Structure formats: C-alpha cells, structure tokens
C-alpha cells in the first residue's frame, strides 16, 4: 500500500509499504529516498512517536495514512510544549530556532495555525522574531501554549494578593477549563481554586456563558487552602460571607479577604467575635476562632451613614452614603449593587419623588431612613390613583400588571395594605387577578381608591 510521510519543511514523500513493515523498515525506505540516516528520524502518527520494533499495523496505519517526520538534530535539543488541556508535545529544536519556527513545528504536529498560538516561557509571551537562545530556553525546558481563540475573548482573574492574570477563553469554556488554564499559568491545582464572580462561587461543570461572564470580566480567585478552614462573616444587613482562611491568618489578612470579596476598605471594617473587637495584628488562633466560626462585621463609616432602599419586590438594599450625596449619586450606588440603570429608577421618600440634583440632607434623609425604589419601566406607562381625600398618587405600571401588583405599588407608596384597598375604574370594582389591559386601562387613566376598613363591611 502507499503511505505518505510529511516533513517539517512541508515536503511530502510517498512510500510503498506493507502493513507488516516495521518502523525500522520504513525509516530505511526514507533513507533510500531522502538520504536521512534512521537515527536522525523520528516518525509521528496520530500524535504518537513510533517505535522502531513495532509494525505499521500495530499502530493501525492504513493505506494513504500520513506520518510526520521530525529530524532529531545533531547539536539540537528537545523542548516540551504544554497545552492548557494538559497535553505535552515534544519538539526537536535548535537554540538558534526562532519562535516562528517553533510555532511552525507545533502546527506540523498539532495542526494549530501559528496565528492562533501564543507561547509563554517563565511568565513571558514569546515574540515571533526572537530565538530560543534569546530567551535562554535550554534543553528540556517547558513552554506553555495558549490558544488565541477565534471568537474567543480575554477575561481577568484577580487573586487575593492583588495580582491580575489574563486568560484567553471562550464563552463555552467550563469553569473546570478555566481552572486548568489558571493551573497552567500559575501552578495552582484546580482543587485549591475557588472562583467568584458577582459574589457567586462558580461551579466546575457550568460554562462562562451560564454565568453571563463576558469579555474583560474580572473573576476573583480564592485559594481553598490545604490545612485551611472556612469561617463565616455576618454583616449588619444579614448577609453572610464565606472566607477560606488559616488559623495563622491575622485579622488584617481577614479584612483584606473581605475587601476582595465585598469591596469594603479594611479601615472601615470592625470585626467582632464573642463580643470582642478583633485587633489587626493578632491571629485567628489568638482568639480561638475555629472552623465554621462566625464573625460579625460592623462597617465604620467615614462621616457616613447607612440607608435602606426597599424595592417593590420587597427586597431591601443597604447603601453606604453621606448626607451630602445627591440623589444622582444614590442612584449610581444602586446601579452598582443591582445593575438597574439610573434612568429607570424613581426614588420615593415620605411620599415624595426625589430629584436627581438635590441631596439627601435637602430631604432630611437621615441614617437608617428607608427610601422606596420604583422602576420607571421602559414600555411602561403612568396611571393616577385618586383617593377619597382628593389626593392623587402617580404609579409607574405596565399594561400587563395585575390589579394585585397595582395594590402592592400603592402599599409601597402609601403604606395601605392591599386587603384594605378597593380600586374602581369606569364605575367597576377591579379584581385582583385581572390585568390593567383586561380593563382597557391606558396611560394616564385615573383609578379611584376606596378604603375597605377593617371591621367594616
């Protein structure tokens, strides 16, 4: 049968062989054709180097298969190239080879176009025109191959030490793949890595797109330390943060981990355990803090204060503000926390809609005041609700809102429980389960609110 032998220069040789021929026989045929001594030949098939004593049929080499011929150069050397999948490729090179040559050899072995290859050695990306000796790459050195993916993207991974790693990924990569890439770059075993995005720990089997991680997103890397332990930190808002620590960590270290997770500067953090405020220079073991202990975090505000923002869904957000903050600033903080664009936010306090240019102190909003957040819905509309006292309330609604939703909005604005509200439109009492569009209620329609008094009829 015929087989083909392709050299690194791109030349293809055709050989007549039998399935029972040994690799040694094949090398002798190549020597006959090309004059290359067998001891300088290495034959590769399906990514495997072929051994002299084995036959073509041992390797399932059939007619018209293509082998790759790599020359074992006198005065040359072997180097290794490790891919992000953990596969290691062996290359025959000379110190005078350029990075471009090396990429061509990788293409020959693996089929990866040079323009998709990035080679890393000692943490440095290697430039095409430089040679291996320029980078002091010696025999049996290991290079790392990162694919510059078409349709790929870059993301950043920030460690607790503040170091930022750049990774080439695709949206379809699993978290497991990402951890393998981090291992490749940093040497940290995947089982010691915890990746956090938007406050959530990422699960190995899920993909980046599952978590809506897009190009240039930043993940946070927390090490799950062997011999380490987990502790919990509870904030005044009731949120619980999980930290990976060691008993030898100082309180200062713990505050740095909290900053990394929550963005709260250490100088604004006070940590309490067993009723004691913890001092920066002491360790967790000094205070006998053991695995799964819970610390309490109190935020020491710079001349600031906490306020609460309650949404129509009943969720309460805690914000750190100053009395001099404008309503615009407050909306920006809400956007940071909740992702709601300021132009969709309406803030209500004491029944008044707050104007962007005014400050909290203008409205006498003090510490621990509660604002109400109403969304100004795109594709939404305003309607009016008139009470028997003659007061008119403005609501932001959508035609698909149920009467129940509308009553919840009225409760949010006016504090009147839904079960005390009766809404009338066009002389009809409106039923909870129906929508505004069911009743043909359009923008700027006026509903009438009648109170159903407790104990009344």
UniProtKB/Swiss-Prot annotation:
Q: Does the keyword NADP apply?
A: no
Q: Which residues form a coiled coil?
A: none
For this UniProt record, the keywords arranged alphabetically read as follows: Cytoplasm, Isopeptide bond, Nucleus, Repeat, Ubl conjugation
Q: Where in the cell is it found?
A: Cytoplasm; Nucleus
Under the heading PROSITE patterns, the entry gives:
UBIQUITIN_1, UBIQUITIN_2
* Covalent link location (Glycyl lysine isopeptide (Lys-Gly) (interchain with G-Cter in ubiquitin)): 48
Q: Which Pfam families match?
A: ubiquitin
Residues spanning the membrane = none
Q: Where is this cross-link: Glycyl lysine isopeptide (Gly-Lys) (interchain with K-? in acceptor proteins)?
A: 76
Q: Where is the Ubiquitin-like domain?
A: 1-76, 77-152, 153-228, 229-304, 305-380, 381-456
GO terms under cellular component: cytoplasm; nucleus
Pro-region residues? Answer: 457
Q: What more does the record tell us?
A: For the sake of clarity sequence features are annotated only for the first chain, and are not repeated for each of the following chains.
Could you say which protein family the record assigns here? Answer: Belongs to the ubiquitin family.
Please describe what this protein does: Ubiquitin exists either covalently attached to another protein, or free (unanchored). When covalently bound, it is conjugated to target proteins via an isopeptide bond either as a monomer (monoubiquitin), a polymer linked via different Lys residues of the ubiquitin (polyubiquitin chains) or a linear polymer linked via the initiator Met of the ubiquitin (linear polyubiquitin chains). Polyubiquitin chains, when attached to a target protein, have different functions depending on the Lys residue of the ubiquitin that is linked: Lys-48-linked is involved in protein degradation via the proteasome.
Q: What's the protein name? A: Polyubiquitin
């Amino acid at each position: 049968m015929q087989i083909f032998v392709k050299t690194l220069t791109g030349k293809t040789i055709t050989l007549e062989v039998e399935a029972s021929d040994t690799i040694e026989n094949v090398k002798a045929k190549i020597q006959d054709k090309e004059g290359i001594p067998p001891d300088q030949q290495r034959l590769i098939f399906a990514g495997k180097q072929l051994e002299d004593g084995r036959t073509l049929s041992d390797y399932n080499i059939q007619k018209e298969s293509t082998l790759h011929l790599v020359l074992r150069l006198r005065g040359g050397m072997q180097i290794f190239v490790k891919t992000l999948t953990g596969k290691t490729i062996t290359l025959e090179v000379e110190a005078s080879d350029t990075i471009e040559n090396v990429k061509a050899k990788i293409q020959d072995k693996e089929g990866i176009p040079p323009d998709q290859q990035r080679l890393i050695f000692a943490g440095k990306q290697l430039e095409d025109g430089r040679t291996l000796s320029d980078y002091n790459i010696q025999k049996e050195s290991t290079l790392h191959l990162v694919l510059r993916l078409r349709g790929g993207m870059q993301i950043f991974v920030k460690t607790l030490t503040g170091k930022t790693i750049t990774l080439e990924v695709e949206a379809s990569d699993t978290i497991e793949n990402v951890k393998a890439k981090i291992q490749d770059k940093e040497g940290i075993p995947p089982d010691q890595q915890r990746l956090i995005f938007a406050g959530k720990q990422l699960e190995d089997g899920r993909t980046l797109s599952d978590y809506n991680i897009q190009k240039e997103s930043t993940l946070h890397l927390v090490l799950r330390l062997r011999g380490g332990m987990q502790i919990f930190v509870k904030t005044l808002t009731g949120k619980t943060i999980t930290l990976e620590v060691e008993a030898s960590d100082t309180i200062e270290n713990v505050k740095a981990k909290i900053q990394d997770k929550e963005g709260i500067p250490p100088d604004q953090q006070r940590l309490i355990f067993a009723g004691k405020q913890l001092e920066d220079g002491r360790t967790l073991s000094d205070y006998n803090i053991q695995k799964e202990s819970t610390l309490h975090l109190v935020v020491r505000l710079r001349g600031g204060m906490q306020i609460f923002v309650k949404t129509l869904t009943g969720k309460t957000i805690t914000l750190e503000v100053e009395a001099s903050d404008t309503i615009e600033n407050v909306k920006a903080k809400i956007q940071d926390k909740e992702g709601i664009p300021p132009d969709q936010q309406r803030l209500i306090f004491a029944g008044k809609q707050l104007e962007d240019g005014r400050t909290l102190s203008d409205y006498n909003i003090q510490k621990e005041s509660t604002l109400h957040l109403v969304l100004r819905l795109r594709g939404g509309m305003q309607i009016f609700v008139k009470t028997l006292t003659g007061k008119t309330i403005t609501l932001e609604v959508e035609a698909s809102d149920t009467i129940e939703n509308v009553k919840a909005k009225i409760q949010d604005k006016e504090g009147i429980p839904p079960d005390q509200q009766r809404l009338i439109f066009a002389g009809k009492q409106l039923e909870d389960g129906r929508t505004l569009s069911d009743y043909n209620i359009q923008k700027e329609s006026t509903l009438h609110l009648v109170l159903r008094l407790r104990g009344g009829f």
